[in-house]
From Swiss-Prot:
Protein name from the UniProt record: Cytidylate kinase
InterPro entries: Cytidylate_kin, Cytidylate_kinase_dom, P-loop_NTPase
Xref: PANTHER family: CYTIDYLATE KINASE (PTHR21299:SF2), CYTIDYLATE KINASE/PANTOATE-BETA-ALANINE LIGASE (PTHR21299)
UniProt cross-references to SUPFAM superfamilies, sorted A to Z: P-loop containing nucleoside triphosphate hydrolases
Amino acid sequence: MSDTAASMPYPVITIDGPTASGKGTVAHQIADLLGFHLLDSGSLYRLVALASMRENIDDHDVESLVRIARELDVRFKADRIWLKGEDVSLALRHESVGNQASAIAVHGAVREALHARQRAFLEAPGLVADGRDMGTVVFPEAVLKVFLTASVQARAERRYKQLIAKGFSATVESLSQDLEARDLRDRTRSVAPLRPAQDARQLDSSDMTVDEVVAQVLDWYRQVQGANKAN
């Protein structure tokens, strides 16, 4: 067990990966099964994106974006998210909001403004955090770091099914193009680029079911906890 992990008051599992890799669904199920709190860090960026779009703020207006990030009036409950008292759970899933979130996430000042808010999610008995830099930046001391990937085709098909089920129009081809563009932007940004932590366990979920991925992550967590107790 590392010194940093030993210093954590409660265990943290981070699940990072690109858009539509399934990390959110997996994180939600892991948190439910372990009775841990859940941090969907992507929702925070989407909230900043949605709020900025409603105020007609350009994604290069860093000062205004930081203000929004610091002043977010947000409430999480179960699988619902409220912004200024309005349930925006469905609005946050729109592709335009996701693209805006990816664009503003390149700004270090915005990420810094959300950092303390993300760290505050760590409470007893533990936390499952999903995002793009949970294991590399926000919780580098996590007891288990998972980097979940999948092919662009598999991710586009998953996202297509999700959007159609929620009443949005989309095509697999357009979604594939959007995913490739967002992947490139996330991987090449100068601040907290999308990459696996050095000690992350990588898992390609292209040909796996959600249950199979959840089972693998739980197995890794039990292995880590068993090793920590042995030490």
